[in-house]
């Protein structure tokens, strides 16, 4: 899988979109799989809990829908697109550390049925998200 390594330590995969609030979005037809980025999980450090969104919940882009708790802080997870939550990653209730171990794979948080595909254009490309990390980190 093609990736960008930012600052020698933050992995950004090239097959998905990103949000300014550090969510990644993998679009498959009208479904979006959402998780938090490698950058976000490294900033949070050891993740110890996850509050998952409700199934069938209708959400708008930028609505807070989930919470990830680490030993350091709790962080809201925002829906990057409008739609309906159709699935959540139940493995995270027992093993929240999957977000640290595999943020772009087994650590996914929820799946969304997209209601407005035009919103995808507002998301960041891997290159733009990489630039955002560089700005934040002074790289």
From Swiss-Prot:
Tell me which cofactor or cofactors this protein depends on: (R)-lipoate
* Residue positions where N6-lipoyllysine is found in the record: 72
Xref: Gene3D superfamilies = 2.40.50.100
Question: Biological process GO annotation list?
Answer: glycine decarboxylation via glycine cleavage system
SUPFAM superfamilies documented for this protein: Single hybrid motif
Enumerate the Pfam families for this protein.
GCV_H
PROSITE patterns, alphabetically?
Answer: BIOTINYL_LIPOYL, LIPOYL
One Gene Ontology cellular component annotation held by this UniProt entry: cytoplasm
Keywords (alphabetical) are: Lipoyl
Cofactor note text: Binds 1 lipoyl cofactor covalently.
* Superkingdom, natural source: Archaea
Q: Does the keyword S-adenosyl-L-methionine apply?
A: no
**Which stretches make up the Lipoyl-binding domain?**
31-113
InterPro entries annotated for this entry? 2-oxoA_DH_lipoyl-BS, Biotin_lipoyl, GCV_H, GCV_H/Fam206, GCV_H_sub, Single_hybrid_motif
Give a short account of what the protein does: The glycine cleavage system catalyzes the degradation of glycine. The H protein shuttles the methylamine group of glycine from the P protein to the T protein.
The record's comment on protein family reads: Belongs to the GcvH family.
* Subunit record text: The glycine cleavage system is composed of four proteins: P, T, L and H.
User: How is this protein named in the record?
Assistant: Probable glycine cleavage system H protein 1
What is the native source organism of this protein?
Answer: Sulfurisphaera tokodaii (strain DSM 16993 / JCM 10545 / NBRC 100140 / 7)
């Amino acid at each position: 899988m093609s990736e960008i390594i930012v600052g020698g330590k933050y992995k950004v995969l090239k097959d998905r979109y990103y949000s300014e609030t550090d969510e990644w979005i993998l679009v498959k037809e009208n479904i979006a799989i959402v998780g938090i980025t490698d950058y976000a999980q490294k900033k949070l450090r050891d993740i110890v809990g996850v509050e998952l969104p409700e199934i069938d919940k209708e959400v708008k882009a930028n609505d807070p829908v989930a919470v990830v708790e680490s030993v350091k802080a709790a962080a809201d997870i925002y829906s990057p697109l409008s739609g309906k939550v159709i699935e959540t990653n139940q493995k995270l209730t027992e093993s929240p550390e999957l977000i640290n171990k595999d943020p772009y794979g087994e650590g996914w948080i929820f799946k969304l049925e997209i209601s407005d595909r035009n919103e995808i254009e507002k998301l960041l490309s891997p290159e733009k998200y990489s630039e955002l990390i560089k700005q934040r980190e002074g790289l």
